[in-house]
Every structure is written in C-alpha cells, then in structure tokens.
Design a protein with these regions (language model features):
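N-terminal Lys/Arg-rich, disordered targeting/topogenic segments
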Residues: 1-9
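Low-complexity, intrinsically disordered/propeptide-like segments
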Residues: 4, 15-19, 59
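Proteins with a high burden of low-complexity, intrinsically disordered sequence enriched in S/T/G/P/A and R
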Residues: 8-12, 53
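Hydrophobic membrane-insertion alpha-helices, especially the h-region
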Residues: 12-28
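Catalytic glycan-binding domains that act on GlcNAc-containing polysaccharides
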Residues: 26-187
Length: 187
C-alpha cells in the first residue's frame, strides 16, 4: 500500500505544476487576444510625443472601438479613438493638418495622432487624468461645469461625475490601462 502512494506523489508533483502552468499560459494567451497591442509603433510614437502613458492610449482605443478602425458611434464619432467631425476639425487646426477631411479619421495613424494629442490637451487643460478622460468622453464644456459645481468638483478636481456613462467610461479606461500594464509589463 505504501508503494502505491509513493508512486502517485511523484506523478502528482510533476502533473500538477504542468497543469497550473498550462492554465496560466492559456489564460495569458486569451487575455492577449482580448487586449491586443495593435498599431504599437504609432501608439508608442505619439505617446512619446505627447508624454502620455502608452498603456493609457491602448486602454482608450480598446474602450472606444476595441481596435476597430472602421468604428462609427451613434454620435458619429469615427475610428479607433472615436473622434467626431467638429473635434477632428479643432484638432486638425491645432496640429496644422492641411486638407483634413472627416474620412481621414478612419486612417489609424491619423486617428491615433489626433486622439492622443487631444487626450493630452484635455489632461493638460484640466490638470488631471480623471478630468481629461471625463472631458474626452463627455466634452470639455461639461467638465468645466462639473468642476464649477461644488456637488461634483472642487474647482480643480472632479469628486463626483454626474453622468453614469462618463463615470463608467473613466473606470473602464483605468481598469484596461492596468490590464495593459500587467499583460505587457516588459514594454
């Protein structure tokens, strides 16, 4: 009887770690499929130019379009980072992009360049990541009004986001940013 127990332990000692390793690798591969790093050269380039964390940019793209360059929202925002025509025109003027057309928002490099610049602009304008992300989602005018209202902000920082959609958006982007940071820690 003792002999059988001895044989089972070494087999279990080998199989159990292999099973755990297999499950961990399978989970990692699934997460990498769910949270890809597409357009990495472009993202890294514009992250460096704007000083933004590339994981934040990947998280915004994932949240906005799930990396679908042909995405169009019900509000007519277009491309990877979901930029609408009016915002696109504003950004193109600031970036001195001659001959900008609304259809250019479907070009990944153009959309990432514009979206990254705009997010950086909003974060600088409002002085924080939460406020910048909220403005990216709900618009700068709304964030200004929230900051001015003691129920939602202290004049500088948002303490409460009154739009559930925007509150969830900020939370989702932050969660995805953490996922990207963990999955691609070597990057």
């Amino acid at each position: 009887m003792k002999n059988r127990k001895r044989k089972k332990r070494p087999v279990l000692g080998i199989l159990l770690p292999l099973l755990i390793l297999t499950l961990a690798l399978t989970g990692y591969v699934l997460y990498v499929e769910l949270f890809p790093m597409r357009y990495s050269e472009t993202v890294e380039q514009y992250a460096a130019e704007t000083g933004l964390d590339s994981d934040l940019i990947y998280a915004v793209i994932h949240t906005e379009s799930k990396f679908r360059e042909d995405a169009v929202s019900p509000m007519d925002a277009k491309g990877l980072m979901q930029i609408n025509e009016i915002t696109g025109e504003f950004i193109s003027e600031k970036l001195e992009m001659a001959d900008f057309l609304d259809g250019d928002l479907f070009i990944p490099e153009t959309n990432i360049r514009m979206g990254t610049w705009y997010l950086s602009y909003l974060m600088e304008l409002f002085g924080g990541e939460t406020e910048g992300l909220a403005a990216y989602n709900a618009g700068p005018s709304r964030v200004r009004s929230w900051l001015a209202n003691p129920e939602y902000g202290d004049g500088t920082n948002l303490t409460n986001i009154p739009f559930k959609e925007t509150e969830n958006y900020v939370m989702r982007v932050r969660q995805r940013q953490k996922i990207y940071r963990v999955l691609y820690f070597w990057n």
